[in-house]
Amino acid sequence: MSNSWWLKPAQAIDVPMREAALARQQQLTKPAGSLAQLERLAVQLAGLQGRERPAADKLWIAIFAGDHGVVAEGVSAYPQEVTGQMLHNFVNGGAAISVLARQLSAQLDVVDLGTVAPLDLPGVRHLRIGAGTANFAHGPAMSAEQGLAALQAGRDSVLRAKAVGTELFIGGEMGIGNTTAASAVACSVLECAAPLLVGPGTGLNAEGIEHKTRVIERALALHAEQAGDPLHSLFCLGGFEIAALTGAYLACAQEGIVALVDGFICSVAALVAVRLNPSCRNWLLFGHRGAEPGHRHLLETLQAEPLLDLGLRLGEGSGAALAVPLVRLACELHNGMATFAEAAVADRPA
């Protein structure tokens, strides 16, 4: 494809700054390694941000929304109109991510990529690509043109975030049926059996999970030619919001903004991004390990060390948002603690 912007290499890690941050960590008034993952996080951020003392104060949360044709197969516990209703809830301040964004002083960017029924909501950026995706149980979920538009929508949100000095980017999603789409994409990319990744989503019972698994298996057989191909798996089996998340993660790496990845659906988008452009992996932090059974497998595949494990399964970017205070505190500890010399505290003998 022409103008394959997503193949542009990610920005390089600033190794001298990472080493300077590590040296500082080793001089802070605590036993070496005693703050464990928080120490590693601060040092990692220093290398990514190119400064010895990193920060995560300026936060951007983008919520990408779109409907899914595969809902016609009866794979969701909720009706399709909930997608549009939740867009109202996001901008009216009543959703979980809305509350979290307020508490974290984050910019909330709500993007409608294609609900079934067109919406006219103040506070939502309407970038409609279609009236939801097509039913991937019978054909491709989207055309290449639609898929590229969705990737670009994610990139555009990151460019907006960069323009206001964002230090940490969170992508969230809303779309009834999107755990089905995400599971199908991941199975195709990883060429693995559906039962390994398929779970209850928003609350299916055992019978519902079995039906959802069968639908995905039929779709994987239909689109078998795309197996192992991340871009075409995304376009044939994914959703507009999953493609936008993929584009956002790729753009974050290219523009030098750290991305904090949410749960299962966002991790599938991260998987596609990394398979398309492995250099973007360094720029992805992972907020939590969710309750969806396949999430653990994805995190292991991505060699990710999530910050939280609370059994969450909401989506919306909520798990990543809940991890932001930990990221900020890791920075504050790194930046604000005294060294042994400054505090006149004896260090451990060499």
UniProtKB/Swiss-Prot annotation:
Describe its function.
Answer: Catalyzes the synthesis of alpha-ribazole-5'-phosphate from nicotinate mononucleotide (NAMN) and 5,6-dimethylbenzimidazole (DMB).
Enzyme class per UniProt: transferase
According to the UniProt entry, what is the EC number of this protein? 2.4.2.21
Q: Care to name a GO molecular-function term for this sequence?
A: nicotinate-nucleotide-dimethylbenzimidazole phosphoribosyltransferase activity
The UniProt catalytic activity note for this protein reads:
5,6-dimethylbenzimidazole + nicotinate beta-D-ribonucleotide = alpha-ribazole 5'-phosphate + nicotinate + H(+)
Family according to the record = Belongs to the CobT family.
Whichever gene encodes this chain, its name is cobT
| Keyword Transferase listed | yes
Q: Could you tell me what this protein is called?
A: Nicotinate-nucleotide--dimethylbenzimidazole phosphoribosyltransferase
Q: What is the lineage of its organism?
A: Bacteria, Pseudomonadati, Pseudomonadota, Gammaproteobacteria, Pseudomonadales
The metabolic or biological pathway listed in the UniProt record of this protein is: Nucleoside biosynthesis; alpha-ribazole biosynthesis; alpha-ribazole from 5,6-dimethylbenzimidazole: step 1/2
Say yes or no: keyword Transferase present: yes
Tell me which residues this entry annotates as catalytic: E316
Its GO biological process annotations read: cobalamin biosynthetic process
Record's CDD domains?
DMB-PRT_CobT
Provide this UniProt record's keywords sorted from A to Z. Cobalamin biosynthesis, Glycosyltransferase, Transferase
- Name the source organism: Pseudomonas savastanoi pv. phaseolicola (strain 1448A / Race 6)
